């Protein structure tokens, strides 16, 4: 109770609070940062055995998902069967790592390894792993014998872990040591953050995408300075965004500078859970628990207290791009040509041309002839 009061007091004051302990419900790994963690677990088992202990007692205490998605290299492109060829090369290069991960899944409890070629960890997280609301494992019940229900939360070893914030799952990226501790059931320490509210109104205009909203967020939040803050979206405009649009906005959290960009649960969330194959019982549980906990998006509810509130009318968001080097340097698409010429002038780029031959045809290219989009 005393800890809860300190957290609430710090939040109301709009100040960073003292250090508190946080125990996430699960941990998400990708292969580049996750493999060293499971190597550590294996070494711990060896050390335990050397000391005369039972090595099988060394196990993750919370569900851990590791998705192999960072090893992909597109060696072959532009032809039929190129995906299969790239997969063969990937297994050839990473056979030892994949053998180890297969052993880890078979040897440790609470571990699920997703093989390569299944998708990106953050997309799989919101489609398959996240439950929004969780029930305690068998054998862990309340005083009356019923299961304990609690919110799904996570930490991940990738900076874009907040993608899950889009469907109402609190989570953020951490380092390998913190993820390892969380997997072993140890709480990680964090400071009580300032919570910034972003009140959304209006609806997106035709032709405006969630990425345009993300770039607007990046510009807006970087100007305010939200490093170390939690950002929570609320207001009538939330209902205008689908769950996948919200996930796209939350995915860009590292570019905003904040720790997470959290959306509440509503009917759009439930629609997404149904679309991705969650059971009717799970969807009903999410709805009931979110409403009971005041986590349901209700524009008519009494306003919450935030350290700061930022307003954004979605109808004012324009098709945009960013750059040339920073995601928060937003440029309205209508002004892209003008801004490009200005950048060329600022950098002293002349009107040089280059001749290239493509399929027997000769082309004269100038600066700006080729555009590459990172999505």
Regions found by a protein language model. Give the residues of each.
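Fe-S-dependent hydro-lyases/dehydratases of central metabolism
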Residues: 1-375
């Amino acid at each position: 109770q005393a800890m809860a009061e300190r957290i609430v007091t710090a939040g109301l004051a709009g100040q960073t609070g003292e250090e508190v302990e946080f125990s996430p419900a699960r941990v998400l790994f990708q292969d580049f940062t996750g493999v060293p963690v499971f190597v550590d677990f294996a070494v711990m088992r060896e050390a335990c055995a050397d000391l005369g202990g039972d090595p099988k007692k060394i196990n993750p205490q919370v569900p851990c998902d590791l998705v192999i998605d960072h090893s992909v290299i597109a060696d072959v492109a532009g032809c039929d069967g190129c995906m299969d060829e790239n997969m063969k090369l990937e297994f050839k290069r990473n056979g030892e790592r994949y053998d180890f991960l297969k052993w880890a899944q078979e040897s440790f409890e609470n571990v699920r390894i997703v093989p390569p070629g299944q998708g990106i960890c953050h997309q799989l997280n919101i489609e398959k792993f996240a439950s929004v609301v969780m029930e305690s494992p068998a054998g862990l019940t309340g005083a009356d014998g019923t299961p304990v229900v609690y919110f799904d939360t996570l930490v991940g070893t990738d900076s874009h872990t907040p993608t899950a914030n889009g469907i109402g799952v609190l989570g953020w990226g951490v380092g390998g040591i913190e993820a390892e501790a969380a997997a072993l059931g140890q709480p990680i320490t964090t400071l009580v953050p300032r919570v910034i509210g972003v009140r959304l109104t209006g609806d997106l205009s035709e032709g405006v995408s969630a990425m345009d909203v993300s770039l607007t967020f990046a510009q807006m939040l970087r100007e305010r300075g939200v490093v170390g803050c939690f950002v929570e979206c609320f207001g009538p405009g939330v209902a205008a965004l689908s769950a996948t649009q919200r996930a796209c906005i939350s995915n860009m959290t590292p570019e905003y500078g904040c720790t997470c960009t959290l959306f509440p649960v509503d009917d759009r969330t439930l629609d997404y859970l149904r679309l991705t194959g969650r059971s009717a019982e799970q969807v009903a549980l999410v709805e009931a628990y979110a409403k009971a906990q005041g986590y349901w998006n209700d524009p008519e509810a009494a306003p919450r207290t935030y350290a700061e509130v930022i307003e954004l009318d979605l109808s004012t968001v324009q098709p945009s791009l960013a750059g040339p080097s920073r995601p928060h340097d937003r440029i309205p698409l209508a002004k892209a040509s003008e801004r490009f010429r200005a950048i060329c002038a600022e950098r002293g780029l002349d009107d040089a041309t280059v001749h290239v031959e493509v399929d027997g045809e000769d082309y004269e290219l100038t600066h700006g002839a080729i555009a590459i989009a990172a999505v």
